[in-house]
Swiss-Prot record:
Catalytic-site annotation from UniProt: 172
Documented EC number(s): 3.6.-.-, 2.7.11.1
Catalytic activity: L-seryl-[protein] + ATP = O-phospho-L-seryl-[protein] + ADP + H(+); L-threonyl-[protein] + ATP = O-phospho-L-threonyl-[protein] + ADP + H(+)
Protein name: EKC/KEOPS complex subunit bud32
Source species: Aspergillus clavatus (strain ATCC 1007 / CBS 513.65 / DSM 816 / NCTC 3887 / NRRL 1 / QM 1276 / 107)
Physiological role: Component of the EKC/KEOPS complex that is required for the formation of a threonylcarbamoyl group on adenosine at position 37 (t(6)A37) in tRNAs that read codons beginning with adenine. The complex is probably involved in the transfer of the threonylcarbamoyl moiety of threonylcarbamoyl-AMP (TC-AMP) to the N6 group of A37. BUD32 has ATPase activity in the context of the EKC/KEOPS complex and likely plays a supporting role to the catalytic subunit KAE1. The EKC/KEOPS complex also promotes both telomere uncapping and telomere elongation.
Ligand binding (ATP): 26-34, 49
Sequence ranges assigned to domain Protein kinase in this UniProt record: 20-277
Amino acid sequence: MSSAEPYTPPPLPSPFTNTTPPPQLLTQGAEAHLYKTVFLSPSTPAALKVRPSKPYRHPILDRRLTRQRILQEARCLVKLVREGVNVPAVLALDWEGQNTEKGFGGAWLMMEWVEGLVVRVVLERWERWMKRNQGSSGAEELKEEENWVRDLLRRIGRAVGALHKAGVIHGDLTTSNLILRPPGHVGEQADTGESSPSMEGDVVLIDFGLASQSLQDEDRAVDLYVLERAFGSTHPRTEPFFEEVLNGYRESYKGASSALKRLEDVRMRGRKRSMIG
């Protein structure tokens, strides 16, 4: 059997085809590619999100949808920065609506680069450390570790509360879309396996590709439900502490009570769907 051919991303938008150093591809999704690049000077890192054109769509519809989605994401980010929510700042954006060549016609959004680890990685490291040390560490040390993770979850809840207070719905709230930015914005922490990961720092929300502006409690509740399900499927040791997320949510958002009441309804519908299959 022949090996699969290496993935070749679509061409970069024209402003970045001759950038030195070239943008570094970090992740690729169905709708967008994320690169690490620089902004104005080599010493200023930036995140570049590229939405390539879709060759299977009619060109006019493709340009309209791509432009609409990149603008919606940028508007949500600008609004959140203005409201003091921890999200990447928008540095620049553009779309190539007049370029109908194959591989172009897409759009791009350049944002502030956020140092740190995604919360998913932090919690996975913490859970591995807890599993290794469950029998060898004392009760006080394990309790202290639990307190650290509880505090992190409360900060996550406060970040989501600030998001919803500003009238923005994330649309894809998972621990992969949260970054723990360490104090002083230092680089990534190495995983030595010898100690539990640091949980100090600010929680920054990222990836607003599915975000929208809404004041509906139903939308807020669905956001929270998606995050709750993400904990259940990805972080089994941390899931029992999820109530701390909701406690932090209550602390930062005065309208939390009605949103959390609606969350109960959303949970009920989710359980019914699971039973029906």
